[in-house]
Amino acid sequence: MDASSISPDHAVTVEPLLAERIEVLRGPATLLYGGGAIGGVVNVVDKKIPTAVPEKGIEAEAELRGATGTKERAGAVGITAGEGQFAVRVEGMKRRTSDYDVPDWPGGKLEGSYSESTQGSVGMSWITPRGYVGLAFTHLESKYGLPGHNHEYEGCHPHGTHLHCGGHDHDHEEEGHDHDHEHEHGGVPYVKLRSNRLDLRAEYQDPFAGFEKIRVRGGLTDYQHDEIEGGQVGTRFKNKGYDLRVELQHKPIAGWRGVVGVQNAYSDFRAEGEEAFLPRSKTRSNGLFVLEEYQLNDWRFEVGARQDWQRISPSGGASRSSLSGTSLSAAAIWDFAPQYSVALSLSRSQRLPNAQELYADGVHLATNTYELGNADLGRETSHNIDLTLRKHSGDTTFSASVFHNRVKNYIYANTLDRYEDFRLIEYTQRDAEFTGVEGELRHQFTPVFSAAVFGDYVRGKLTGGDGNLPRIPAARAGVRGNVTWQQWSGGVEYARVFSQKDIASYEDSTPGYNQVNAVVAYRGRYGATGYEVYLRGTNLLNKLAYNHASFISSVAPLPGRSVLLGVRMTY
């Protein structure tokens, strides 16, 4: 719970360096966490609350790494100790990066792309043979620049559907101009962030008749970040709230296994200062969900359902939004031959608008936009079909997927007008559709060497031939080779990211680029300590590249060449 959903320049308070694993959930399983995740859900699993007492009384992990192009210096450590029925977890992380290198760019660096972050947590659990209950407190402090934050547009304001900037209307001939990065560099604003969170987690086996397990997850969050320019706090964002979910895993019923659960969340969001483009808003949400699975010979069936209720109460006299949404999903996986399977997923999902989409009204200089919300927005409804063919074992494996989504009343940021790199956007609803393919083919040529080809493509447009949707990622294709020999492993990957010319009104096309990445690693043991030393290179061709999906792609290109050296240890 932070401010990342309000703007792409607001950091997510999740630290990958301390994550145990990162999962991507698709199909009916996404309904465990929300009804509007058309493309899937990213679930970060951490170890801040122990779930078991270490067998030898203590376990530890540590990682150190440093990079060239970003000047990253980072370290993380986690220690779990336990005795009897109690276990304690302590972990910490510190990272610092400088403005990263960019080829063919004024000064050779992207001004304002630096970051600093420090995080620490302490967790404790009471553990029994049938489950555990634990608490953890996490404190995060972060500071990062805002690249592309341009105060030349401070005087821009809307007049109907047009922009007025610098005492004159915008020139409509600006539409579709090429990338131009000859801009003035002044003092770059930055964000200073603080977050405190208290987490509760509990699991218990066989809690009562008919159920195998109960899981409880909850948290209290106190989040604040200041946007600072010239030593003065220009905007302060605050978010306080809680989230709670309870899942019950039932015993098999006529062969069906699954979970039912409830979710409740509350947040009180405030934005104060010159960029406070949102009123204070209180959001209350509740959800009921069920996910079931059935195995029948070579077939596996999954079904899921979710009902959501959301109420957003803004200050300042704006109308309250009170909406509900119903989402349904089903999938069938058929292992039709040894090593082969085909999966078909169908879903009907509903997403409810957030406070930004409903109530925004003001200049947002971090994204070079003036944002207009629409308090009359309703739910969006998506009908999705996804077909996947896999060969999952043998020397040759592959996965190929095709999907099509039709969305009624799709909510998106529509650009009404543009002056240079500044846009007037309004959150609106239109019917839209998305079509995409992705695939990978891999072959194990020898016990040591394997190679793969991969690619993905998505097309997003308004229905009825009314134009393209903005910020749709460009198509990508590539090839990678991997080597594994004794304790060594390594790989090289080449990817071609194609130009994006299917653009919306007032949007620039983005040129394509080539990217080469490589990694080599060595794993070993020293007594009771396992270790891995790795060397990773990114954008080794040092190509100037833009991310079309970014609001500020033309003024904030991707990093240039960087080489990272790191070591990871476990005890």
Enumerate the language-model features and the residues they cover:
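C-terminal beta-signal and adjacent terminal beta-strands/loops
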Residues: 350, 406-408, 499-501, 522-571
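Gram-negative outer-membrane beta-barrel transporters
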Residues: 258, 399, 403-407, 425-503, ...
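Transmembrane beta-strands of outer-membrane beta-barrel pores
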Residues: 64-70, 83-85, 94-98, 128-130, ...
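Outer-membrane beta-barrel signature, preferentially recognizing the C-terminal barrel domain
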Residues: 165-199, 320-321, 327-331, 335, ...
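Face-selective signature of the C-terminal outer-membrane beta-barrel domain
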Residues: 132-134, 138, 192-335, 341, ...
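Periplasmic-side early beta-strands and strand-to-turn transitions of outer-membrane beta-barrels
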Residues: 5, 49, 60, 76-191, ...
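Acidic, small-polar-rich N-terminal luminal/periplasmic segments of exported/outer-membrane proteins
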Residues: 1-52, 71, 387, 551
